[in-house]
């Protein structure tokens, strides 16, 4: 038997519809319902009791359902039913429900990583695929995080999220969860899920997203679980999930109907409830605590400051207008691609210079705005642009940290800074200048989460357009945009109308003059054949095994070659094989990684970095400045020989 999201009640229950209205019409209706139920063997006294109960609840709409089961009648609801006696916005559903054990067998390929489980939609739609994983998750959690618990559910609005929401709700109820808080229409950005978990003191939450990967019937879907701190589940849990997927035998599901996710309110099913919530409210409340919204509003309503935000038809479309327009006063036409769509409008919701082409053309066009930004599928990534100026993600996190005094949340100072290993060393120099603890971690936000929970990190970032702070335990696209607007506003706080604006480019160049510039670029080769990509990595590992300090690579002298490993200073866990590094004596670096965030094939990422202190060279194009290192990287790796690729899919 395969689990079906459409199953709303056990098959041995017989439905019959009754009216909740009073008066003569109600009496006639009740007589008809009694006759109908009698045909199913329900006693007249049971009918009378049930219909009396229905009438006493002062139904505000039709649609109550009486389920006849072995001569007993109990209340359920096939359609949404509002009941005044239960309080405004409360939707009363069955007083109880049955839990069904659905037999199942293990399904291959459910290995769960840092970003959860990501596959093609069709795979998730296959019988029991998602249900197996959800049940395996519940079987992996401590009892106190399941029985009677409160969990958050949200996603980026991509195709299959609505169906998946119903599956998750029913299995949650079947496993004894007490309450699900779900964003309206099943929508909530990844950082908002983290914020809601923390604000509502939930035991955890589900994020339905494949992040920046394309959406639609032929494309990607994903799911992950975040813990009570709001951060992605640690490997101790994800490893258990995978282990349980290999031995699963049953799925526990509740016989409840699909929940209407379009309207705010509480749906009660006995001691289990589903509350449909505004996915923006808790998140916006948090942002108002972090930033000076009056300062931000002053800039965004200024006649000589123009702002553009590309929501890429992704989840931040649900947040952009309430935050930027309604709360901060930006013109409504500041937002474009602002309606979340299941297929992201046919686009690739990855905020970089390639996939956010529409924004890039605006920001590099004639009469360009002063500030442009974009966010990705689930709202955790960001891209920042000035007028004809691009801020690399590596520079972005460094510049935010260096200008933290523009953000009230940091008024007591920064606790520490952290970056992922492939991210440039720009943040390192800020940490040194400010005398702050600094951490270099593997790629994956969970490593930052451990540092944050231990009070050791305030600001962190990844070169993959992820920036954030300890206000939540996920990277946060809108937070990064507001951080940058805060910096621009703070730099212009004493500016009089008509005076020259301190621009994004001015802020970047001022930073480089003080700290030097880390030229940085990333080459992505997407959906390479895994066999060739793995052979390339083995080839590189053979090279580093034989390498020694002083080896020459063109004009560069090797300082260190290794496969990055990390021992977590908080929990002592060790992560190995996190990226192959060639570090040269002048601080330049070449790094190779295989990315695991796609749903098919392998993505090879090559990172190149060179530090430059000479201000006369800071305006060089990054590709020109880095060309010698890029040539070395391609030659040493033999990428074309192993993969057949002659050019990257994306250059950042």
Curated annotation (Swiss-Prot):
Residues the record lists as binding Mg(2+): 211, 376, 378, 380
Sorted alphabetically, which Pfam families does this protein's record hold?
PGM1_C_vert_fung, PGM_PMM_I, PGM_PMM_II, PGM_PMM_III
**Residues the record marks as active site:** 211
Q: Which reaction does it catalyse?
A: alpha-D-glucose 1-phosphate = alpha-D-glucose 6-phosphate; O-phospho-L-seryl-[protein] + alpha-D-glucose 1-phosphate = alpha-D-glucose 1,6-bisphosphate + L-seryl-[protein]; alpha-D-glucose 1,6-bisphosphate + L-seryl-[protein] = O-phospho-L-seryl-[protein] + alpha-D-glucose 6-phosphate
Write out the GO MF terms: magnesium ion binding; phosphoglucomutase activity
What the entry lists under InterPro entries is as follows: A-D-PHexomutase_a/b/a-I, A-D-PHexomutase_a/b/a-I/II/III, A-D-PHexomutase_a/b/a-II, A-D-PHexomutase_a/b/a-III, A-D-PHexomutase_C_sf, A-D-PHexomutase_CS, Alpha-D-phosphohexomutase_SF, PGM
EC number assigned by the record: 5.4.2.2
Q: Which cofactor does it need?
A: Mg(2+)
One GO cellular component assignment for this chain's record is: chloroplast stroma
Q: Which residues carry this modification: Phosphoserine?
A: 211
PANTHER family, per the entry: PHOSPHOGLUCOMUTASE, CHLOROPLASTIC (PTHR22573:SF59), PHOSPHOHEXOMUTASE FAMILY MEMBER (PTHR22573)
The record describes the protein's role as: Catalyzes the reversible isomerization of alpha-D-glucose 1-phosphate to alpha-D-glucose 6-phosphate. The mechanism proceeds via the intermediate compound alpha-D-glucose 1,6-bisphosphate. This enzyme participates in both the breakdown and synthesis of glucose. Required for sucrose production and accumulation necessary during plant development. Promotes gravitropic responses, negative in shoots but positive in roots, by facilitating starch granules (statoliths) formation.
Record protein name field: Phosphoglucomutase 1, chloroplastic
The UniProt gene name for this protein comes to PGM1
């Amino acid at each position: 038997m395969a689990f079906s999201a459409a199953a709303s009640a056990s098959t041995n229950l017989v439905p019959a519809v009754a009216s909740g209205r009073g008066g003569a019409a109600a009496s006639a209706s009740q007589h008809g319902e009694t006759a109908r139920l009698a045909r199913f063997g329900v006693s007249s006294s049971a009918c009378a009791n049930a219909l009396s109960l229905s009438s006493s609840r002062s139904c505000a709409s039709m649609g109550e359902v009486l389920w006849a089961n072995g001569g007993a009648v109990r209340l359920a609801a096939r359609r949404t039913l509002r009941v005044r006696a239960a309080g405004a916005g409360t939707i009363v559903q069955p007083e109880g429900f049955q839990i069904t054990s659905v037999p199942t067998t293990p399904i291959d390929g459910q290995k769960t990583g840092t970003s959860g489980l990501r596959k093609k939609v069709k795979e998730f739609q296959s019988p029991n695929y998602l249900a197996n994983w959800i049940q395996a998750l519940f079987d992996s959690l401590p009892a106190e995080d399941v029985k009677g618990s409160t969990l958050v559910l949200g996603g980026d609005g991509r195709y299959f999220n609505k169906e998946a929401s119903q599956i998750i709700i029913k299995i949650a109820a079947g496993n004894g969860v007490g309450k699900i808080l779900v964003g309206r229409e099943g929508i909530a950005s990844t950082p908002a899920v983290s914020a809601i978990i923390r604000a509502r003191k939930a035991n955890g939450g589900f994020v339905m997203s494949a992040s920046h990967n394309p959406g639609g019937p032929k494309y990607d879907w994903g799911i992950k679980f975040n813990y009570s701190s709001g951060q992605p589940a640690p490997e101790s849990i994800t490893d258990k999930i995978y282990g349980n997927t290999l031995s699963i035998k049953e799925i526990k599901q509740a016989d409840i109907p699909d929940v209407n996710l379009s309207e705010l309110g509480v749906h009660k099913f006995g001691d289990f409830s589903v509350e449909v919530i505004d996915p923006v409210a808790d998140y916006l409340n948090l942002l108002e605590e972090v930033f000076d919204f009056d300062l931000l509003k002053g800039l965004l309503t200024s006649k000589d400051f123009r702002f553009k935000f590309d929501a890429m038809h992704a989840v931040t479309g649900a947040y952009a207008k309430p935050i930027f327009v309604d709360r901060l006063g930006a013109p409504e036409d500041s937002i474009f691609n602002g309606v979340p769509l299941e297929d992201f409008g046919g686009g690739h919701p990855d905020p970089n210079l390639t996939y956010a082409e529409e924004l890039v053309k605006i920001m590099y066009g004639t009469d360009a705005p002063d500030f442009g930004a974009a966010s990705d599928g689930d709202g955790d990534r960001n891209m920042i642009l000035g007028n004809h100026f691009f801020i690399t993600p590596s520079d972005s996190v460094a510049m935010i940290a260096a200008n933290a005094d523009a953000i009230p949340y940091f008024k007591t100072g920064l606790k520490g800074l952290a970056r992922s290993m492939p991210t440039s060393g720009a943040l390192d120099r800020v940490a040194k200048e400010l005398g702050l603890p600094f951490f270099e971690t593997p790629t994956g936000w969970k490593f930052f989460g451990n540092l944050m929970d231990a009070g050791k990190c305030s600001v962190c970032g990844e070169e993959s357009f992820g920036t954030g702070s300890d206000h939540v335990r996920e990277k946060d696209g809108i937070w990064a945009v507001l951080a940058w607007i805060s910096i621009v506003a703070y730099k212009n706080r004493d500016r009089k109308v008509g005076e020259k604006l301190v621009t994004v480019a001015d802020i970047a160049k001022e930073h480089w003059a003080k700290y030097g510039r880390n030229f940085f670029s990333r080459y992505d080769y997407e959906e390479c054949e895994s066999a060739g990509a793995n052979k390339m990595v083995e080839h590189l590992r053979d090279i580093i095994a034989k390498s020694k300090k002083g080896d020459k690579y063109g004009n560069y002298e090797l300082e260190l070659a290794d496969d990055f490993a990390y021992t977590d200073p908080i929990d002592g866990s060790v992560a190995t094989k996190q990226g192959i590094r060639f570090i040269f004596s002048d601080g330049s670096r070449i790094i190779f990684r295989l990315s695991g965030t796609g749903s098919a094939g392998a993505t090879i990422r090559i990172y190149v970095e060179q530090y430059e202190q000479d201000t006369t060279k800071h305006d060089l194009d990054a590709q020109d400045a880095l060309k010698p290192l890029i040539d070395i990287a391609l030659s040493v790796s033999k990428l074309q020989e192993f993969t057949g690729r002659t050019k990257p899919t994306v250059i950042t």
